[in-house]
Amino acid sequence: MKYKVEIVIDEEKVINDDIYEPSEMYEFIRNMFKRFDLAEIKTDKPYHLIFADKGRNRDYGALGKSMLDLYYSDWFLKYAKKLFWHNNVNESVEDVLNQLGNKT
């Protein structure tokens, strides 16, 4: 595994806003990465999601596309607490919300 995308959703805000069902939101996020057959690394919290490459040449682009599709969706930034891009090749972690700007 060379690359990972890590997402943390503010579940309390999702519940308090009462616009989206948290479980449906998490399933939507999962499906964004499943469409490219990317691996999900299970965590002990439903609002903490991690997706990784499977070592295929196309996975880098698929991870990036899925992450940016979420970033530019109309609801994601309102509820995202963390969005990290992990690069195990050069051992770096990028805070995407700070790099691109959290527009909420």
Residue ranges of each PLM-predicted region?
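Ordered hydrophobic segments in well-structured contexts
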Residues: 2-6, 50, 82-84
